[in-house]
A protein has these predicted regions:
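Helix-biased detector of long, well-ordered alpha-helical tracts
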Residues: 1-182
C-alpha cells in the first residue's frame, strides 16, 4: 500500500484561534462527508483516510489477497484480509460510482465552508468549537470536553451508502461503525 499524505502547518495570530469551549445546551452542526459539495467535481463516497484499510478489507473479495500481496501486512490473520464479496468495478448501490472509486474518494476538506464561517464575525463568535471527526468518528467530540458533559446526537445525517454497504455485508454493529467511520 502506498500512502500519499501531506501536513499543513501555519502560525495564526492568537486572536484568530478558535478555542474549544463546549457548553451545556450547545447545538452540534454536522457536515456530510459524502455526496457532491459545490466545490467538488465528482461524487464523494465519504471514505476518510482512517477508514480506508478497514473499508477495503471489509468489502473487497479475497481474490485481491493473491493478486496484490503487497497491499496488506503479512502478519495480519488471513481471515481479515480482503474478506468481502465485491470487486473494484462492482456498482455501489445508491451512488453513481463503483466500489473502487468509492473507497478511493478523497477525504473531504471543509476548508471552503469553514473559511466563510470564520470570516463572518457574528457566526465565529457563536461557535464554541470545531472538531473534525477523523480519528474517532462520531465519538471524537468527547476528547475535547474539559468538563463532565453528556453529548447527545439525536439527529444524525443519513448513513452514507458506502457505510450502509459495509454495515450490511460485514454485520459490524452500528456502535462500532460510528466509532470507526466519519
Amino acid at each position: 500500500t502506498i500512502i500519499v499524505d501531506s501536513t499543513v502547518a501555519c502560525r495564526p495570530k492568537r486572536n484568530e484561534i478558535l478555542e474549544v469551549d463546549i457548553q451545556p445546551d450547545n447545538v452540534i452542526v454536522g457536515f456530510s462527508s459524502y455526496g457532491q459539495a459545490t466545490y467538488e467535481n465528482a461524487y464523494n463516497a465519504g471514505m476518510g483516510s482512517n477508514g480506508l484499510t478497514s473499508g477495503r478489507h471489509d468489502l473487497l473479495h479475497h481474490s485481491y489477497h493473491a493478486k496484490y500481496p503487497e497491499s496488506f501486512d503479512i502478519n495480519t490473520d488471513e481471515e481479515y484480509i480482503y474478506s468481502g464479496q465485491f470487486s473494484l468495478t462492482d456498482s455501489l448501490e445508491g451512488t453513481p460510482v463503483d466500489i473502487g472509486k468509492a473507497l478511493l474518494s478523497p477525504t473531504r476538506t471543509y476548508a471552503p465552508i469553514l473559511n466563510k464561517i470564520m470570516q463572518d464575525t457574528a457566526l465565529k463568535g457563536a461557535i464554541n468549537g470545531i472538531i473534525h471527526c477523523t480519528g474517532g468518528a462520531q465519538t471524537k467530540v468527547v476528547k475535547f470536553l474539559d468538563k463532565p458533559l453528556h453529548i447527545i446526537k439525536d439527529s444524525l445525517l443519513e448513513t452514507p451508502p458506502l457505510y450502509k454497504t459495509i454495515h450490511e455485508t460485514t454485520g459490524t454493529s452500528m456502535k462500532e461503525m460510528y466509532e470507526v467511520f466519519n
